[in-house]
Amino acid sequence: MIAVTGSTVGKDGTARLLKDDTVCSMSKSDFLIVLGGCGVTEARADFGARVKEYRDLPCSVLFIDGSTDDYDLLAEHPFFPWNGGQIRSISRGITYLARGQVFSLGGSSFLVMGGAPTPDRDDLGKYYTWWPEQDISPEDEKEAELNLLDNGWRADYVLTSDRPRGWGGPGGSEVLERLAFQTDYGTWYFAGPEDRELPDYRAVQVCDRVISLG
């Protein structure tokens, strides 16, 4: 099984997962994908304690980065090839999915693009409440374009932390807007402050729900 969910930051980030029927039915051969805001790499958290919490889940955890990650901590883990894309192995059963990659999982293709801005940030909070690396870069966009080209500009699923700018609401990413225009995708899942469907865009905003993709 492959499932997606929203942010799991905070010391109680895994508590709702342990109460979820979908998660409880999973095994270590199944993947739960956190769409940005994974508590394992949350800034100023107890890394060892967080790793234990996530390894105690019944499933394996994949995640993309968002606006709350410690990017210095992420950078300590080297890249490895896996299922068609690049990953960072954080611990056994906990894996970071790099930006702009197209992965093959369970017979489906997944374009992933982490990264999300922090609103109203200033230099005083730099490397404390926000990191420059959290913004999607031109290099990230180019990586996605090259990998999509290799896959015929097609992905069964797109997984992002932010959303395309033209989809309504404050903020949003111009890079993701361009990728949405260029990519022939099935369903787009992205993190947000509430769970809601965006049928006009074949998209789902995910907060607390755990959604099985089969």
Residue ranges with predicted function:
Residues 2-4, 31-35, 112, 157-159, ...:
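Structural motif
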Residues 104, 178-183, 193-214:
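Binuclear metal-dependent phosphoesterase catalytic core
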